[in-house]
Amino acid sequence: MGKKKYLFLIIISLLSKVHAEKIIFSANSMTGQAGNTNTTTYLSGNAYIKTDSMEIQADSIELSGEDYKNIKAQGKVVGKNLEANMEFTCDSLDYNRVTKVAQLNGNVNLDDKDNDVNAKAEIITYNQEEDIAILQMKVNLVQKDNVCSGSYAVYYKKTQILELSGNAQVKKKDDIFRAQVINFDMNTQDIKLGGNVKGTVKDSKEKQNAEQENDLQPNQQNIEENQQSVENPETKDDKSKEAVKGETQ
């Protein structure tokens, strides 16, 4: 019982001399020298680490480099970028505390909470200083009613600009735009297409007609029932006559 409690309470706070950043981490087990920041430290089992700008949970975490500048996480990675207000999940992560660049690998899901943007890809590299994310392979980004996809993308968080390439596509409700390169301003909703441009756009009249057809469908059954009542008035009269006969008897 005492051993389990000790492992659960392994929480070490370090003050980096160079970067003046406090690091807090915990795990079920640890190997390495906690007081020596020039060695590699391994955390395994419910590994957790928190810096001033990043919070990470994973099956295992490795800390290395001078003042533990390199952080590697493996297995069911869940994290938050506290400064950028972004949350993410992935299979593995590499983060450099000095450059503040994080690379998320495998089944990456990234949520930009400030702009209500969700991004998915196999690899996402996020530069915290520049507020720029580079998405690679199976890119899918959703913002409001817009669904954007491609093989490569650059997402500018501050300006809300998205650059798509490689079978690039932007779908805005019923409208679809395809090109080799797409530049999409998510603030103004302006789209610039370049190379092998294709698109399908519904005009306002078509959209209005489609909406009217949808509104008419639920009333169709009532109309048919009313028509049947008008076409067969004798049925109602016969029932009335039978009721009168019954009362007379």
Question: Language-model segments: which ranges?
Answer:
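Mature-chain termini and adjacent capping regions
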Residues: 1-249
